Structures are given as C-alpha cells and as structure tokens.
C-alpha cells in the first residue's frame, strides 16, 4: 500500500480518480477509509494510489486526490466523477462521460475512461492502474483497449459492461475520444507528467483512449459505434454491471476499456463479438500468447487483427521500452495491456505513440477493441504485461523489467486492475482498483505503479510480485527450463521468449528492481505471471488461452464476463450479491473486494487479461451458465490447445466467443483436458491457458461466470483458477478457483466465488457437484483434465484436489466456504468469492506463480492478488504456490484449487468489505492455504509439475527455491515476499488493507501459510502442522496427489514446513507478522478505512460488521502507524480472517493432504527436513528480517523443517498459546506447518507479529478495539473455520483426521519441542523447530502413535474436553507431547479449526486483552501465556478458568459481539487469565470460543454467529455449517442480538464447558471424527450437549463473571430490556432496567443494561441472592439491612385522573430534560398506595414507558457519570443500605452525566429505571409539586411548555440527577427508598439559588447553610463532587483543579452523608 500509496502518490491524481471511481461503489465504503489510508499514504498520490491501489477506500480519498488530479487533468475530474462513475458504477461511467464531461474529462472519463474508467477503474482496477501504471493514458487508452482486458469490463463490460465500459467508453469514447483525444493528446502530450500525475491514468487512458476511441470509433466505427450503441448497453451493462460488480469496473473499465470494451462490447455486442472475437481471439491469443499479443496487438494496431496485437505488442514493447520512462506507466499499461501496449506500442511507439487516439484506438478498434481489449485486457492482465512482458513479452517484461518495471508494475497494477476489473468487472476492475481497494493493493499497486508509483507499484507489486518475481526469477532460473519448456512449448512464440525472458529475465529484472519485480512480479505476475507464467506454465497456451479466453471469453464473456467480472454471478448468480458487491461491490465489491477485487485482482492481473479472455471466452460461452461450463471448458480449452495452439486457439476461440463461449468453453475443456495433459508440461498451458483463460475468465469468468454463474464460474474460475495459475494459477486457480474454488471453495464458496467469479461460483457448483462427483475419478485426469478443463478443472480439480479429502475438504470446506463465504459475502457473496478469492489467488499466484507453473497461474493469482490487494501479493504467494502445485498435478492442482479456493475465499475475504472480512478471513485463510497450497503447490507442484511431480528435492529446491525465491521462495520469497512484500505489501497490502496486507503478505507466504495454517487449523489445522508443511503441503500434496504430495511434502516439508512453516511462519509473521499483518493491518486499515475493515471487507457488505470491524480496524488504524502493528492487527484481524479462511481452507487442505499428505508430509518432513531447514533458514533469516517478532522464532527456521512450522507455530504458537490453539497447535504441531498454518491465520499475528505486534497494537490500538478486532477476526475466522470445517469437516476432516493424525504425529514429534518452543515461543520456537527438525524420525514415530489412535483418542479426548485441554496444557508444557499433541491437534484440529481459530482469536483477543491488561503484555508472557496459560489454561479452564472462560467468553462475546468497551475491557481483564486458560482452553474452549466467535463473529461481521455455533454444534452436517456459513454472510446481522445475547450465552456456555469447547473444536475434529465416522456424531452431540451445559454454566458465569465483567450482564439484561414495561407495575415485577447507552463511534450506540430483572427480582426475593443479578451486592443487600426509610414503588402511569398537573420532578420542580437533566423517572408511588394501583398498567403507560425508556436510556447513558460517583455514593449510603451500593453502583455508572450527579442514593439508578419504565416523555414533577416548575428559573415560560397531564396525587417523578444527589434516597430492587423522607425534608428546605422549596443538596462545608436543588446547584456553579456526592457552594469551592481536597474526599462520604442527613 505504501508502495501503492507511493504509486498512488505518484499517481495521486490518477489513483485519485480511480479511488473516486472506486470510491463510488465499494470505494465509497472503502474510499473513506481507503482514501484516508491512501491519502494518508499517498497524499494525493496516496489518494491516487489509494485510488488505484486502495482505489476502494482510497478512491474517495483518491477522489479528493482525483479532484486535485482532476484539476491537474480534466480527466481527473472525470476520474473523480468517473471514479464515482466507476465507483458510481457502469452507468455512471456512461454518465461519467458527461460527468467527466470536461473536455479531458470525458476523455478522461474513460481515457479517463480507460484512465479514468481505467484510472477510475484504476478505480477500475485497470484503468487507474494503467493510469497508475505505465501510462494509464496510453494504456488506459489501452486500458481502454485493455479496458477489455483491464476491465474485464470487457468481461464485465461484455456482460454488463462489455459495452458498459465500452458503451460508456463509446459514448464516453466518442466524447472521450474527442475529449480523450484532447485529453490523451493533452495527457499524452503531458503524458509523462500528466499521466503520471493525473494524466497518467487519464493521459494514458485519455490519450490512448482518444486514440482508442477515435481509433476505435473511427477505425472500429462499427465497433465503437457499437460501443456507442453498446454504450447504451454500457448503460445496460452499466445497470447490469451496476447491478453486478460490473458497473463500477465496467464503467471504470468500460471507460478505460471502452475502446476495448466498446470493441469488447462489440465483442460482447454482435459486431465486436465477431470482430472482437477475431481480434480478441488474437488479441487474447496474443495476450494469451504474449507473443501473439504484441503481434496481434501490433498487427491489430497495424492490421487491427490479433496478430497485429502481437506485433503491436512487440512494437509496443519496444515502444514501451522507448516510452518506458514516459510510458513506464504507459508501458506498464502497454505491458499491462499488451493490446493496449500493442496499441500503445504502435499507438505509443510507432503509430500514434499514444498520442494518436486514432491510432491507439485503431489498434484497439481494429481489434475491435475486443481483441485489443482482449489483448489489452489480457495482455495487460495476462498478456498485456506478459504480452508486452511476455510477447515482446520478455521484451516487455524485460523491457518492462527495466522501464516497464514501472510500466510493468503498472501493467501489473493495471493488469491486476485489469484483472480485477475483469474479474470484478471492468468496474470491479475499477474496483479491483477500487477493490484494489483491494484493488488498493492490486490496483494501487498497479495504478500507483503507473508513473513514479510505477516504482512504488513496482515495489508494491514487486512486493506482491517479489515472491512472484523472486519466484519468477528463481522459478525462471530454476524453472526457466520448466518455464521455458512449459512456456516455450506452450507459448512457443513469444510466450516462450517472453515467458522465459520474462520468467528468467524479467523476473530477474524484476527482482533486480523491485519495480521490475513488481512489474514482473506484479505486472509480470499479472502479465508475466499471468502471461508469462501462464505461458511459462501454459507455454503460449496461457497466452493463447488468455488470448483465447480473453478474446473469446472476453468477447463472449465480454458481456457475461463483464457481467461475470462484474460478477454476473453477482449479476446472474447473485446480482444482488454481486450488485451488492458489484453495485456497491463491483466498485464496492472491490470493496467487498472479496470476490470483486479478487476477480479484480485476478482480473487485474491475468484475470483481466486472462479473465478478460476467459471472461470473454466465457462470456460468449459463459454468458449462459451452461455456457459458463463450456466457458470453463473454453477457458481451459485454450490451455488445452496448447500454448501456440491456444494462441491460435485463443485466436480462434476469440472469434468463437460470441458463439464460441460454449465452444470455447468446451474447447477449453477439451483442450484443457488435452492440454492439461500437456498442461503440466504445458501445465502452464492448461493452467496458463486456463490460467490465462481462468485468469481472463475469472475476470471474465467473474463476469462471464458471474454471468453464467456456474459454467462461467467454472470457466472463469478455472480460467481464473486455471487461467490464473496460468495454469498453476490458472489451473490451481482454474482448478483451484475453478475447481478448488469451485470445489473446495466454491462448495463453500461457490456462491461467493461464483458470484465473485461466477466462474468460481460456477465452479463451486461444479465443485460441489462435479468436483465431488468427478473428484476421485478425475483426480488422475484432473491434472490433465481439470486444469485444461476449467469445468473439468472443477471436477477434475476436485479430483485432483483430488484427494477426495481435498476435494471433499475443499468441497466440504469450500462448499461451506462458498455458501458461507457467499453468505458472508452474501451481501456481495460473489464479489467476495470472486474478487477476493480470485484476487488473493491470483495475487498469490502472481506472487508465487512467478515461481513456477504457478507463475502463469501465479500471474493470475497474483494479478488477482495484486488487484485484490497487495495482499494478493501474499495471496499470490499462496495462490501461486497452490496454482503451481495445482498446475503441477491434479492433486497439486486440486490442492492448489483448494488453495485457490481458499485463496479465492481468502481473496474473497480480502476484497469483500464485510464480505471481505468473511471472505477475507476465508479468503485470507484460503489464501494462506491457497498460497500455501499454491506456494506449496507452486513449489512442489509447480516444480513437480515441471520437474515432475515426484522431483521433490528438485521440486523442493525449486519449490523451495521458487517457493522461497519466487513464491516467497518458500522461505526466501516468503521472506523476500514478505521482506519486500512486507515492505511493499505493507504498502501494497496496506493498499488493499488488511486483506491486502494480509492476503498479499500472508496471502503470499502468510496467506499461504495462513491458508495452510488455516487449513491446518481448519481441518486438522493441526494435523497439517506436523506436515504442517506436509500439511501445508498436504493440500499441495493433495494437489500433487501422492507423488506431488510426496513432492509437495518434500518441498513443503522443507517448503511446506519451511515454506509452510518458515514460509508460513514467515508468512505468518508476515501474514500476521509485521509486514504482512502490518500491511494487512495498514492495508486493511486503509482498506478498512475505505473498506471499513479489511478484516471485514464486508464494509462493503455489511454496515454492522463494518462498524464493528471499522471500529476494530480503526483501532488497527491506530497501529497502522506501525507496519508491525498493522501487521499485528492484520494478523489479528487477518489471522482471524485467515484463520477463518484457513479454517475454511484447513479442511480442504487437510482433506487433500490428509491422505497422502500425512505420509508425504511425514516423509517430506523427514526427507525434506534439510531443504526445509534451508528454507526455514531462509525463512528464518528473512522472517527475521521481515518480522521482529519472528526474529527469535525465525532464528530457528534453519533448525528444522519442523521448526519452521514450529517457528511459525511458535510464532503463532505463543500467540496460539495465548490462543490456546497456538499452544495446541504449536504443541500439536510440532507440525510446524499445522501450527504455522493454523496459527498463521490465528496466531501468526499472535506469535510473530502478534506477540510484538499484538502487544504493540494493543498498546497502540485501543485494547478493546484490538481485542475486538482480534475477536472479530478470530470470530470470523472461527466462524469461517467452523463453517468451512463443518462443510469440509466431514470429508476434509476425515482426511484431516488421518492427516491430522499424521500431522499430529509429525507435529507431535515437534510438539514437545514445539511446546518448548511455545514455552520459549520467540527464541525457542526456532529451537523447538530445530528439535522438530530432528523429530522427523519422531514424526514418523509419532504419526503412528498419534496418527493412528489419535483420531479416536483425540475424539475421545476432545469429547472429554478436560483431556484435550489438559493434553493441550501438557502438550504446551511438553508434558504429554503425544497425547497432548494429539488432543491438541485434535482439539486444535477440531477446535482450532473451528473453535481453535476462535480460540486463537479469542486468545488473540485475550492476548490483546491480556496484553492490554498487561497480562500478556510481555512477549514472553504471550509466549509463556501460551505455555503457562495453556497448562494453567487447562486447569484454570476447568476451575477458575471456567468462570474466567465464561467471563472471558462472555466478555469476548460481549467484546466481539457487543464489543462494549466495558465488556471488552472486562474481557480484557478477565481474558488474560481466561486466555491463559483459553490458549489451551482454546481447544476446550474452542467451542465456547467458537461460539463467542460465532457470536462474536456475528458481531464481528460473521453473519452466522449463531449459524456458526450451530454449524459447530451441527458439525456433523456440512450442510448445517454451510447454511451457517450462509448465515454467516449476513455479517451485517452480527451486531444484532446474536452478538450480545446469544454469542455470550453460547460462548459462555461453551467456555464454561471448556470441554464442550473441544466439541466445538470437534467440528473441525468432526471431520476427523468423520474420518472415523462415528466420532463426528459423538462430537456433535457432545458439543451440543456441552453447549447445553455451557448454557447453564454460563449463567453461573454470568453471576460469577458479573462482578468481573459487567459487560456480560448487559447482554443478559438485554433480555429484560423490554420486560420492564410489564414489570414496572408489580412490586416484584416492577423491574426497572437501568440502561446505559453509550454511543461508540466504533460500534454505534451500545446499550448496556445495568440491572437485570433477575437482579431486581432476586433482590425482591431476598431468599435468592442478588448475585445472579449483575452485581454481587444484591446478596449483600439481602444480607445487609435495607434503608429504614419508607420506599416508593414505580407504578403504572396514571392515564385517567381528576387531577391535572405538570409532570415535573418532585425534588427540583423542573420538567423532564430540564437543563439536560434527562427524563423524569416514575411514576413512583408510596408503597402502601402502590399496592392499590392496578397491577397491569394501562397500555398508554406501556407506550409512555417505552418512549420514556428510550429517552431515559439515552439520558441515562449520556448522563451516566461515573461509577465511582455512585460507588462513593453507595459506599456512603451503604451504611444505610450496603447492598444498594453495588446495585446502584452498576446503575450509577449509567447515572446521567447531565445531572452532574444524582441523588447520593442509588435512586439515581432507579430514576433511570423509573424513566425507563414509566416514561411519560412529558416533563415530570411530582404531582404534588406542579407549581414548583412555575417558580423555577424560566418557570412561567417553560412552564407553559410543560404539558398538563392527568396526575395522581401520589405519583412522584424524579430526575435521575436529583435522586442521585438527594440524600438518603436509594434504589434497591426497584424500590426507591427515602424519597418520601427526602421530599418531606426538601419541602422545608429553601433553595439558596432559586428560593424555591425542595432543596436537597447542602453545602458540604460545616456551618454553611446554602441549600440547593440539584439543578440549581449546577446553576449556582457549586462544586458537585461525584465521588461522594458532596456539594460545595461557590464560596467553599476548593480551587478549580481540586474538586475535593483529599481530606475532604476522605470525609466527604461520611461528612456528606452526615451533612446531608443533617440537611435532611
């Protein structure tokens, strides 16, 4: 983000307007935050970067910047307007034309359109990115051309905004063409500065677009006219897109890609359909074949045919190189949009070098914009950067590597923007940019990269792509042969050289220059990764696939893709959701950037081009869902065509798209299958093809798939997924996204992903059905088939994912994920799914894919990730690995798919605001998993794929290398990724926000790690630990299947463990650790700012969750100051998200890697220990570099592969310890991966960052907010976990169980050490890991022990929570390493995945709380907290912990759920101890945690708090969880009762039953049980049973906790909030709730009921102790003497009376609300008289009461002064009635502040009650004293206002303050004692101020005769000392500073009461 920010800064204007574009929708939600964040970061540029990168949130800020920029460039206004347009949606884009109507503005609107649309879609992820990037002007023109790409707007635009953007662009294009020409010329003339500044996006876009537009309009007059015609469609599309995600992006992108989109739309439209098809096919082909694209582009430019694009691209590349500095952005755009570039190349270079709108437009236009659009779209996305980068590819990439670095970064940014745009929609692209909110990362990354930000973007992208670049580089170097082989054969043309060059040179270049890396990694990730990787993976296939998909998909998908990208699922599948995502989401969806940005990102990167293609391909075929299936096939078909084949195929399919969507889809499917066969060799092919396609498709698929929900999803996802991986990415993503996402994620995630990617969604369905069905059978063919076939991919990928476990896990997990995520993202489920998922994956891929097969896929992934957020960087890491692995093998692919799914999910989580939170949690979890998968996969699978699935050592080395170097080079790249990524992702990820940071960073490593960890957590989140790497790899293993698993484990043992562990540790450290978490945190913050909470990118989705999250995020925003803190927050937030994601992912991961992964993991652990070591060392050192917290931990990375896991585990182990899961996980995991994985999500922040960061965050961030955030995140994570686990619990957990046991064995081997490690979390973590390293033998030994009997044993133990807890404790203590580990593993596996995450989250919260409470303040404490608290936890958990847990749970629930500061604080206080209990108790308390999680999560924004608890309860049913997940999506719901009432209850219940918590953990375990078959039901039952018991204990807890944590009571009281009405009547029934309403900016109005009815009743029934009531004092009250004075009871309001009087206070004679004294409480009747009153108050009274209650509550809350006052008062009065003291004390806190004080007695509380219960809103004075008000100050005048009401002569009304300050008045059990006496005395007392009778306050000074009414005392300026309710007249007032001298204070109570008594 910083990078982006800087980029943003660089492109402030550009980014600015993108922000605006973005801001409108998602950015509107995001924008404020993002704008703030980005503005914070980029200032104007930051805003711009915000716009681009953080377009979502920053967009608005960027809008401001854009406004500034707008002035800078007319276009910027357009941008701003456009931003709003893009933000406002597609239609706005069209409107924007007018809006942007400034001469430059219309041009800018889409030149601006491209730039603005682009730029705004920088906002649109593409345009702005392009604007940001190279020269958005040129490339935004190209963006316009690439609009198609960039937008998969063309995708989106195709469906919604195929023309949407184009239409806009058309209309806009015409306007803009003229204006854009002006603008472009203008901008182009001022191109460098302007484009870079405002003009870069604008200029580039404007310039290009005029060129494009003029060209397109003139050249492609038909097309452009079509575009214009389509512009109408654009508006339709806009509407559609508006509905869908498309609207923002298409608009943004439409403008940006209007030429293209026009063309594209034309593509979508019939005219361009054919034309675009041809062109696009070529363009896409070119894009697909990066070689082709330049040619195609060039030719297109020249011949306006796809070939021209290639040449053009080549030309462009040179030109880009020529223009690099000038066009660095532009060329980045060029690179980003090869078509754009090509056009830019020609446009820029030869023909109109960017200045000739005609030329450029012609270039686009000739291609009919579809082609260039496709080309551009794909080129930018997949081909643009890769096209330029790949085509001239290497030229461009290399060239871009140098200049294009910025250019390429821009391209990457643009591409990701493109990708996101397509993915999201063009608009989502905008959103990708905005969503780049997530887009912030991706787009700002891309965008910011534009000019100078190019560097930043490059850095950001580099950070995002560093892994990619490093991966790419390493991969290029290591995999260069593979890449070249894969790429070259596949992309024999330029893809070969480009890919190789790009892969080799460019990655190196990129590595050389962060920018280059970013460009290559980011851009290249987008282009290189997408194109290059696709090509590398797919060979040219990727390119061709991309092209094909871009062309065909983009074309066909142009509409659908646009819709898809706009999230046709959103539109189609979930138009509402998508619209939610799209409308608000597409633009906002980026906000909700879950799916959107994901797609955005994905789309942005390759998704744009690939998805543009895929989307388009899919759009043609994917327009229909059936078509989508075809499209997936089509998407994958190009891959199967083979690189060249696909290239030509792309050309063909591109022409096909109109009708070839299905054909394409089928071809893709066929080719995919065939090509997939080639696929692995041409894995990149398949992946690249599908990857490209997938990438394109996701862009498109999101559009297309969104449009054609299923098929497109499958296609899009697979394309995105398959394409994403560019086969690894595309494959994994295609597979993973398509399959994994479809399968694992989509099942869980289909809705979300489908909606997000529609392709994804499509695939989720497929995943659900097909994946599951074809799953096993296709496992073998999955690699070949799945990858090639997106649809098949889904199925095959499922098969590949193969492992049924994985598949099932994916299915189970993902299905729930999908639905859940979808639900989570329900607001913008698709958006969530697609964008985030897509993005994280692409990003991840981009990060990792650069490494390997994933590189192409990675491109996608990365692109997605990039777009999604910089998080996608992490995501890319994750994704790439997954994709690479996925690419490598079916299993790998499956794993990768799973990963992708998780990534998708994660991405989903990432981008979707609230949805994002969910999705992000998922997505991030998924991303981590996916990243892990992808990294693992990429590392293992990719290398395996390329090297052979079984070449693990090489693979490992490669993978390690690549994982390390490329994906983060496992360790290196992880670190590199994190180091740079951290550095950059910090900016980058910050851009996207937490999602970004987390996803990007963690997404990269952490994400992957988290994914793994989450998966580990999720499924045996633990079980993944031992092979934490194996497990981490397990998913990968599953990806790689056995061989790959072996490989995977081998690589991932080293890589998995080092990568997963170290990587994850690193990632963790990063993900949760500083850079990532920081990024995430910061990014999240920024995102949160614009996205609400990155944590809950649901901001986006849900306001409530947003509020909470926003609060949390705002909290985190504070820490955002420090990257680490941010990371910590991110970790806290992200971990939760990640955890949730991870949990979600966990099962799939566990599932896949369960079977083979365990063995492989073990073997790998043993065999790969050294590689792991090396990697771990790398990781360790890098981690150390990256994260401070991880330093000590990271020192051990080299120690062992286990240690890495342990390091990671340590990292999060200590946090986990804090979490209890961490402990369990750490203990359990020795399976470093598992713990790491599990912890990454949860404890990464805990340990690495968490320890430090959390601590710091807590310090920096408000403890409560941190807690809450942690809790929210955790809860979300837990919920996700629960959901995912539940969904995948059965299948995945079974696999996981086995795997978990294996893992456990492995982990257990490490566990004792890890326990030690945990004990010595920071330093020893590594040491333990070293031991763990040593424990490979141990691992093998332990596995049988733990692996074998562990399941049942663990189940039993889990069932018997004490065992688990104790085991966990022992484990933590290293006492029962095996048993404990088993228990821990199972508990953590079950619990941590479900509750574990929650536990971790709770622990996190606890940690935060503890740290805040300074219980866990010290890192050692945290770590020790894990160790100590864990053992202590076990014991405490059962004993005091039970209460503490209850309290903690309650507090946590309250904190997360209610999040009342008090509750949080109380929770914090409680939590530390409780947490200590919880870390271990986390296992036991997992269920409670889960429930708190669920409940908290609901508040957190996990919609299905209850659902989750239910899901956890009903863990036996995946469906149950799935529904729960679906329930979850309504995160918005969370604020409601669940958060308060149910969550607490459930949490407390479960917490109370620490043992029940294990059952909740059992949901994860249930899958294990499921594996066993029987245990699961038992667990469920037990869990439910436990929950039930928990419910009972909860009450006890409430009682016990009542004193400890009052916040709990409010929830309890909430039940009675409405009861007072009826009860006020009867003495016993007269319950006066004292409600304290505090307006929390974070939470909104927080209502705290101070006194529960029970309390009152118990007091009345003295037999009962009042302890039940909140305060123990009631019991004391009972035991102690009550006031001897008579008491009054509140009675019904008199509705009929012969006496009419003024309703005034009986003490002061003033009316209600007099001087802000609040409402009057009453009516109170003398006890004798009250008995005569009717028991049932008249209805009027009830209404009055209600109204009064409302008013009073406010008054009370506002007026509630200090508890101390009341406490003092109570203490003072306790003499008279001690029991009252406590009661009033609680009420006292609610005492009205206005009153400044109240009667000294507790009556203050009572008045509140009175007011609440009785409440005539009219002024109240005692009946008998109606005249008092008249004489009161202002009496006559005011008195006139006092209504005359029928009053009873015996009814008394009082002000809270008057009663509080009156002497001897007490409120006990609803009875007001002493009022009559006080009144009698007062009647004789004359006020010294107003001279009226009724004075109740006397000066405290002896001998002073001044008496006052309470209000008069205030008026007289008396000193009212609330501590003892003493009054000092003005004469005796002490000096101002000292209200009451200490002496007086001491005597105040006694003296005061004495004095008062005397007075009385």
From Swiss-Prot:
GO biological process, alphabetically ordered: positive regulation of transcription by RNA polymerase II; regulation of transcription by RNA polymerase II
Record-annotated DNA-binding residue ranges: 1537-1551
GO molecular function terms listed in the Swiss-Prot or TrEMBL record: DNA binding; RNA binding; zinc ion binding
Zinc finger annotations (PHD-type) as residue ranges: 1885-1933
InterPro entries per record: EPHD, TCF-20_ePHD, Trans_Reg/Chrom_Remod, Znf_PHD, Znf_RING/FYVE/PHD
Residues bearing the modification Phosphothreonine: 1671, 1762, 1764
Ranges of biased composition (kind: Gly residues): 42-60
Result of altering residue 1557 to L: In DDVIBA; uncertain significance
Skewed-composition ranges (Polar residues): 1-18, 122-131, 193-219, 260-270, 277-287, 497-508, 537-547, 693-702, 936-945, 1464-1477, 1944-1960
Omega-N-methylarginine: residues bearing it: 60, 1024
Basic and acidic residues biased stretches: 616-628, 732-748, 946-961, 1130-1142, 1304-1318, 1424-1451
Biased composition (Pro residues): 1555-1566
Zn-finger region bounds: C2HC pre-PHD-type: 1829-1865
Residues carrying Phosphoserine: 419, 430, 538, 559, 574, 583, 640, 871, 966, 1005, 1053, 1305, 1335, 1361, 1522, 1669
Associated disease: Developmental delay with variable intellectual impairment and behavioral abnormalities: An autosomal dominant disorder characterized by impaired intellectual development with speech difficulties, dysmorphic features, and behavioral abnormalities including autism spectrum disorder, attention deficit and hyperactivity. Additional variable features may include hypotonia, somatic overgrowth, macrocephaly, mild distal skeletal anomalies, sleep disturbances, movement disorders, and gastrointestinal issues, such as constipation.
Function, as annotated: Transcriptional activator that binds to the regulatory region of MMP3 and thereby controls stromelysin expression. It stimulates the activity of various transcriptional activators such as JUN, SP1, PAX6 and ETS1, suggesting a function as a coactivator.
The protein's name in its UniProt record: Transcription factor 20
Native organism: Homo sapiens
